[in-house]
C-alpha cells in the first residue's frame, strides 16, 4: 500500500494514511466465454439464479461483481455473503474464539480474495464495517428482510 506521510504539529510523530476514493468503484472484468456472459446476464435479470460449474470457473467472482455493481449503482443496499459452516470430517478446526465475524473469517477467505480483486482490501473492510457487505451463516437469515439486498450463497 502506498500512502502519504503527514507530520503532526507539536509532536515527533508521523502518521501514515492511504487515500481512498470517496465513491465505490468496481474494477471492470471481462467474461472469458459465452457461459460466463450468460451467467452475468442472468444475475442482473433474474431474482434467483443457481449456478454450477467446476472450481475456478468464475462463479463466485462473477456473482460478487454483479452484486458490487448493483451496490455501486444504488440498486441494492447491502450484500449478504453465505457459506456453509459445516466442518468436513477430518478437517475439524475445533472451537474458535471471538465474535461471529472472527469465527466466519476463515470460511470467507475466498470471498475476501475476490472482493479485494474487484474493489481493493480497504474498500472491502469499509463496506463490511458499514454493514454494506455482511457475512452470515444461513441459519441466521431466518426472518431477515432481504428487500434491497443481494444474497450470494456459495459452495452450498
PLM regions: where:
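Conserved P-loop
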Residues: 50-54, 61-130
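Conserved adenine-nucleotide phosphate-binding loops and their immediately adjacent elements
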Residues: 18-28
Amino acid at each position: 500500500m502506498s500512502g502519504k506521510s503527514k507530520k503532526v504539529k507539536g509532536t515527533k510523530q508521523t502518521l501514515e494514511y492511504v487515500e481512498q476514493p470517496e465513491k465505490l468503484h468496481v474494477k471492470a472484468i471481462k467474461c472469458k466465454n459465452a457461459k460466463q456472459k450468460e451467467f452475468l446476464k442472468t444475475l442482473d435479470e433474474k431474482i434467483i439464479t443457481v449456478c454450477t460449474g467446476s472450481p475456478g470457473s468464475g462463479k463466485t467472482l462473477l456473482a460478487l461483481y454483479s452484486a458490487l455493481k448493483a451496490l455501486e449503482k444504488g440498486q441494492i443496499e447491502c450484500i449478504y455473503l453465505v457459506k456453509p459452516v459445516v466442518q468436513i470430517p477430518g478437517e475439524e478446526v475445533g472451537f474458535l474464539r471471538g465474535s461471529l465475524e472472527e469465527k466466519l473469517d476463515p470460511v470467507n477467505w475466498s470471498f475476501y480474495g475476490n472482493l479485494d480483486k474487484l474493489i481493493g482490501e480497504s474498500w472491502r473492510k469499509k463496506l463490511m464495517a458499514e454493514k454494506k457487505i455482511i457475512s452470515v451463516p444461513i441459519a441466521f437469515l431466518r426472518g431477515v428482510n432481504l428487500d434491497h439486498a443481494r444474497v450470494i450463497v456459495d459452495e452450498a
